[in-house]
Amino acid sequence: MIDQTAFIHPSSIVEDGAIIGAGVHIGPFCYIGSQVEIGAGTVLKSHVVVNGVTKIGRDNEIYQFTSIGEVNQDLKYAGEPTRVEIGDRNRIRESVTIHRGTTQGGGLTKVGSDNLLMINTHIAHDCVVGNRCILANNATLGGHVSVDDFAIIGGMTAVHQFCIIGAHVMVGGCSGVAQDVPPYVIAQGNHATPFGLNIEGLKRRGFEKDTLHAIRNAYKLLYRSGKTLDEVKPEIEALAAEHPAVQAFTDFFARSTRGIIR
């Protein structure tokens, strides 16, 4: 179904069965598969491929040579009907690739809302990217990676499969991330190691002084106390009882499967 207010350039192909919302603009030389849904107000500049079982929300800007919903690069994939879901108001720049999920990973690759995916970003099968994230040019996420809200991943950085990038994290450019990065932390290097807290980012997002102080104390326990993670967990949990923002650390530890960067 194609809304009567949508614009589709004559050189583009929209297969029967695709759902194209109100005010969608599909520029020249695009291909839209039969199981694709594109929400109102979304713009495809030109030469964009959207295939597979893919749902794209409202008011996204998708630039040329981007590919969304194509077959993933997992050698075990055998054509199962897995999906891609993208939220609203994302800017997806040139030559971004977002692959469909696998049955082993839950069948879904998901990108939230209000993200900026810069040129040549790759989001592999079964990744989950939250809201208001920035992935800079040539950032690469391996399969099953989670990127939590407000995270920033620098250019030419690669994240190993199954890793978690916590909320408000900043990963510097040209880094290699092979373990989980706790919330609020700045990470850099190959292999990535912690370089303090993303204090400026937290200030821009309205974190109060007492909250920042509590987050600093949690960071010091984690990285400067000389104790093991198991030893500091109860202390961080006690701190979280007084300062809700610190709860992000304890929630993160419960999710972590690859160990945290050190």
From Swiss-Prot:
GO cellular component: cytoplasm; membrane
First-listed, main subcellular location of the protein, grouped into a coarse class: cytoplasm
Keyword list, A-Z: Acyltransferase, Cytoplasm, Lipid A biosynthesis, Lipid biosynthesis, Lipid metabolism, Repeat, Transferase
BP-aspect Gene Ontology terms: lipid A biosynthetic process
GO molecular function: acyl-[acyl-carrier-protein]-UDP-N-acetylglucosamine O-acyltransferase activity
Catalytic activity annotation: a (3R)-hydroxyacyl-[ACP] + UDP-N-acetyl-alpha-D-glucosamine = a UDP-3-O-[(3R)-3-hydroxyacyl]-N-acetyl-alpha-D-glucosamine + holo-[ACP]
Gene3D superfamilies in the record: Hexapeptide repeat proteins (2.160.10.10), Udp N-acetylglucosamine O-acyltransferase, C-terminal domain (1.20.1180.10)
Top-level EC class as recorded in UniProt: transferase
Pfam families: Acetyltransf_11, Hexapep
Annotated compartments: Cytoplasm
PANTHER family documented for this protein: ACYL-[ACYL-CARRIER-PROTEIN]--UDP-N-ACETYLGLUCOSAMINE O-ACYLTRANSFERASE, ACYL-[ACYL-CARRIER-PROTEIN]--UDP-N-ACETYLGLUCOSAMINE O-ACYLTRANSFERASE, MITOCHONDRIAL-RELATED
Family: Belongs to the transferase hexapeptide repeat family. LpxA subfamily.
Functional note: Involved in the biosynthesis of lipid A, a phosphorylated glycolipid that anchors the lipopolysaccharide to the outer membrane of the cell.
Subunit: Homotrimer.
The protein's name: Acyl-[acyl-carrier-protein]--UDP-N-acetylglucosamine O-acyltransferase
Species whose genome carries this gene: Pectobacterium carotovorum subsp. carotovorum (strain PC1)
Originating gene: lpxA
